């Protein structure tokens, strides 16, 4: 009896081994019967991987920057700032008395909060303040406002040694200029300009960052009197239809000069004003429909830019383009994007002078695109490259575009597993 059981057990072992050998020869049934078998991963390089790319300029919208950049970098870059104080306090209440009209001011100042992270400061820094209010000029025109930065309109300023420059600075203003605005109920609009004995760039806090500038003045010559504090506010453009524009124009950056040479066959990210690159992909149907993507690496070749140095680093995020196929204005489409890190967790940290291949992992996004193919109107397979922060640092990165040569243009390396079709062995 024992001998018969041993023979029967041996037959089962042989049958099982035969089944596995048969599975290897029968193809698709093997993974189900023999899960311990290794899975073959295939690689492919898609070149070109983009059907289209383009660079769009002017991000974010004026006044929505997280800081105002004051920069003076020789004949290449110069930026200035504008802060609007369209409502000034015209009355004060002395101790134990009733309200009085202000007829004299003293110790007028504008307080600026500086963000010195990644700032470039020469040995001496000078801040000049100009009256840039003109009721006859188009106050939404950058050129019209820049024309008001003239010597006869300078109403304040001061200089600091680099070692004495703190995170908060008080720049003196002309008392007579401030009083004239108060008495005549006029707007106080300040234009800021920074200069030094070398290349300079520093960020100034804004309403958006929660560290807005502030004007202060005493309502009389009594040094013991408490200064009156006035926050920024914009009253134009007037009307109930423009509240967001008024808010944006409360404080903003003006680009007086950006003379960085443009290159053919490239796309740009960052810079002043901010640039974004829109990349639309063309992926083979068999990759999207018939495989499981385990890795997808977008390779971009960076073109070195002469402007900038090792201090001008820039972080670049790849955002998923969310605008549907009916949005044909691609500049608008670059505003309809995902939050950073959604489906594309990777980012780049580069300097303008860098060169070589930069890689962005995108396998999660490719899997999402595969799931969207069942939609009636799936969104385009596209991403937007965007600097972070945007339009507050003078760093710009450039990459070769799809119109460049085959060895320089964007490519994608994909590792995938062919999907098995299970059936009867």
Language-model segments: which ranges?
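Acidic, glycine-enriched active-site microenvironments
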Residues: 10-11
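Secreted, disulfide-rich extracellular signaling modules
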Residues: 2-6, 17-425
């Amino acid at each position: 009896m024992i001998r018969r059981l041993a023979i029967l057990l041996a037959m089962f072992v042989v049958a099982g081994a035969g089944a596995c050998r048969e599975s290897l020869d029968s193809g698709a049934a093997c993974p189900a019967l023999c899960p311990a078998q290794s899975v073959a991963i295939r690689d492919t390089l898609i070149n070109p991987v983009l059907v289209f790319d383009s660079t769009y300029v002017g991000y974010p919208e004026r006044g929505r920057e997280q800081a105002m950049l004051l920069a003076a970098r020789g004949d290449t870059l110069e930026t200035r700032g504008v802060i609007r104080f369209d409502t000034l306090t015209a009355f004060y209440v002395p101790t134990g008395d009733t309200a009085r009209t202000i007829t004299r001011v003293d110790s007028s100042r504008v307080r600026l909060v500086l963000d010195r992270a990644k700032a470039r400061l020469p040995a001496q820094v000078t801040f000049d303040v100009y009256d840039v209010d003109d009721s006859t000029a188009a106050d939404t025109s950058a050129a019209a406002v820049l024309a008001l930065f003239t010597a006869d309109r300078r109403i304040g300023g001061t200089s600091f040694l680099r070692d004495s420059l703190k995170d908060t600075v008080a720049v003196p203003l002309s008392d007579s200029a401030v009083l004239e605005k108060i008495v005549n109920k006029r707007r106080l609009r300040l234009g800021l300009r920074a200069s030094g004995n070398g290349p300079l760039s520093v960020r100034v806090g804004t309403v958006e960052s929660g560290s807005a500038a502030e004007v202060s003045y005493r309502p009389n010559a009594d040094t013991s009197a408490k200064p009156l504090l006035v926050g920024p506010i914009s009253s134009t453009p007037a009307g109930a239809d423009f509240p967001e524009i008024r808010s944006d124009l409360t404080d903003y950056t003006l680009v007086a000069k950006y003379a960085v040479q443009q290159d053919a066959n490239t796309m740009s990210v960052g810079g002043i004003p901010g640039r974004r690159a829109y990349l639309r992909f063309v992926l083979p149907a068999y990759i999207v429909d018939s495989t499981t993507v385990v890795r997808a690496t977008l390779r971009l070749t960076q073109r070195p830019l002469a402007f900038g140095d090792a201090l001008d680093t820039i972080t670049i995020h790849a955002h998923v383009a969310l605008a549907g196929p009916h949005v044909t204005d691609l500049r608008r489409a670059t505003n309809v994007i995902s939050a950073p890190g959604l489906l594309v967790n990777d980012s780049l940290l580069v300097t303008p002078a860098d060169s070589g291949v930069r890689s962005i992992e995108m396998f999660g996004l490719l899997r999402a695109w595969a799931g969207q193919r069942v939609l009636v109107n799936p969104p385009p397979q596209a991403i937007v490259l965007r600097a972070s922060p945007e339009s507050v640092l003078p760093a710009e990165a450039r990459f070769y575009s799809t119109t460049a040569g085959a060895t320089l243009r964007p490519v994608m390396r994909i590792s995938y597993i062919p999907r098995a079709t299970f059936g009867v062995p």
